Amino acid sequence: MFAVFSKVWSLFAAPITLLLIAQFLAPEVQGFYYTFLSLIALQSFVGLGFSIVITQFASHEWANLSLDDAGFISGDERARLRLISLGRLVFKWYAWASAVFVLLVGAGGYLFLSQSPEPGISWKVPWFSLVVVAGLQFWVLPFLSLLEGCNQVHTIYRFRFIQGIVGSLAIWLTLFLDFGLWMAVAGLGMGLFCSLYLLLVFYKNFFQPFFTIKPKEGIQWREEIWPMQWRLALGGSLSYFVVSIYTPILFHYHGPVVAGQMGMTWQLVSALGSLAMAWVATKVPRFGILIAQKNYAELDRFFFRNSGISMGVISLGAVLLWLLVYGLNYFEHPLAQRMLSPLPFGLFIAGTVLGQITQCQAAYLRAHKKEPFLVYGLVHGFSNGIVVWFLGSRYGAIGASAGYLLVKSLVAVPLCSYIWIKCRKKWHADEVY
């Protein structure tokens, strides 16, 4: 329930944030803000798919574990030690990855943003501050992913709901106080504070053995995790070219104003997709439990019911959002100039609806602790990056949006559906009736 509340809040807060950005930020500063966010998304290149691996592997171990009244992990000792081994491995990995992210993205982003023809905008200190906060938030990610895999979804999403509210309020206050680009630092910083409070207060006893026990035997990274992770690493890295490439391309070739329009549009579209995906993402631990029990019939019923709701939500939301953008342009509202026009907006949101199909299918298959999307990720990422770059650099937002929809229609949905049908048939041959 709180997962849905959280996504509803995001959908509710997004228009308010957009209005305040339009009111308090110049169009050029808006472009810098959304380009900041797109560059921060380069985290996917250092995360190497570990967050998905953590959730999937933890859910399989949690099938034999539970929390006692004091919040400690109890149950099968072998499963407990394997879970602790997994946690210790990923906590160390993310500590190093966070440091690499801060150094490389901080410096690389500085060089990229320095090419802007808007020298009067004060962006350097906010940028480096944002990178540091994002690096800390990135280090916290495996702790949250582990909790999700251990079926603590209700508590996590309750805190994410609170986190979303607090983060939005911080952004709004920063805008009201005319701190400009510091809004990005304020929003992410409050999110980091909420995450740390959850881990250090609510789950202190849960995480205690991860720092006091060193299992002699446990998860074998090379034999168990790496066969799945290296595929996720490639696919996750290339996902940047599917999710976050649009604003930087338009920033580089067409300037910060067009990039700002693209960023605001993508924020609305992403909020809708995130809301719709809540009906599937929160069920992933349950998928893992049913798969471990080989109860595939119940798995399919559970999946189709929730993915159907997800597709219904995103389809209805897409129509409503497009009508909103059309109305703003029809009545010549000033906010219309801060977003893409109805044609490219419609192309982007149509592609997002199609992309929801692949998101649901991917969640289903990855719950099997396998990663069959290597070829898909390579083809989808490269084709989208090349097509969007080629069309976007030449024809602006219309070219980028047309390329996005074209790749979703002709590459992503057909290829992902083929993989889903093939793997589902192969992996469920040993169903327990």
What spans do the regions from the language model cover?
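Helix-loop junctions and terminal segments of transmembrane helices
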Residues: 48-77, 269, 273-294, 367
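Interfacial segments at transmembrane-helix termini and the short loops linking adjacent helices
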Residues: 109-130, 256-257, 297, 323-353
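Transmembrane helix-bundle signature of multi-pass secondary active exporters and lipid flippases
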Residues: 36-48, 235, 239, 243-245, ...
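Hydrophobic alpha-helical transmembrane segments
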Residues: 128, 157-207, 383, 397-421
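Interhelical loop/hinge segments that connect adjacent transmembrane helices in multipass membrane
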Residues: 181-187, 199-243, 294-297, 423-433
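Interfacial transmembrane-helix starts/ends
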Residues: 34, 70-96, 225-229, 295-312, ...
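Membrane-interface junctions at transmembrane-helix termini in multi-pass inner-membrane proteins
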Residues: 135-160, 346, 350-377
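Signature of the first transmembrane helix
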Residues: 1-60, 64, 230-257
